[in-house]
């Protein structure tokens, strides 16, 4: 599989050979969907909680007598039918949202995403991404010159200057290959991979 190598103006300067095991796989929509959903589910904190009729603050006093008033019978004000009452099926921190995905499935799903991005022209290669100073303005100007607005950069090494310069850009994420995830790959409009990162991705996903 050949990928475009971009220059500093964002134009295709040449081609770079990339492993077919990572960038030449067939697209498996069902597998990609499963991998993305599992990633989102496993990222949940699972701390949401609501109160049921037992835990909501209430009085155990019967609101009115059982018969003779003409109104519907009521036992206590914590009933889910009442305003201020508990929930019938409350959310609980004990809920388990985790989804298990086998390692082979995850690797195949990631490779399918990389391959589809390459086919759509949303993935390109650069020699390296470096900035001399930890200034956001410098990195923003570099991406503007390349015509990139929403970009995920997978660099073989992220130094301190690059990390500090990129962290305040809303539509830019700079990561090392080991931190690549399916949601980020799908979310950003363009994915830039450095030459050194290609080999690391091959070791991870091939």
Swiss-Prot record:
Query: What's an example GO cellular component term for this entry?
Result: ribonucleoprotein complex
- Gene3D superfamilies according to UniProt: 3.40.1370.10
Record-linked Pfam families: Ribosomal_L4 (PF00573)
Q: Sorted alphabetically, which keywords does the UniProt record give? A: Ribonucleoprotein, Ribosomal protein, RNA-binding, rRNA-binding
- From the UniProt entry, list the residue stretches annotated as the region Disordered: 44-77
In this chain, composition skew of type Basic residues spans 56-70
Q: Which GO terms describe its biological process?
A: translation
An example Gene Ontology molecular-function term: rRNA binding
Q: What quaternary structure, including any partners, is listed in this protein's UniProt entry? A: Part of the 50S ribosomal subunit.
Functional summary from the UniProt entry:
One of the primary rRNA binding proteins, this protein initially binds near the 5'-end of the 23S rRNA. It is important during the early stages of 50S assembly. It makes multiple contacts with different domains of the 23S rRNA in the assembled 50S subunit and ribosome.
Family assignment from sequence similarity: Belongs to the universal ribosomal protein uL4 family.
Extract the HAMAP family matched here. Ribosomal_uL4_B
Q: Known PANTHER family for this protein?
A: 50S RIBOSOMAL PROTEIN L4, LARGE RIBOSOMAL SUBUNIT PROTEIN UL4M
Q: What is this protein called?
A: Large ribosomal subunit protein uL4
Q: Which organism is it from?
A: Methylibium petroleiphilum (strain ATCC BAA-1232 / LMG 22953 / PM1)
| Gene encoding the protein | rplD
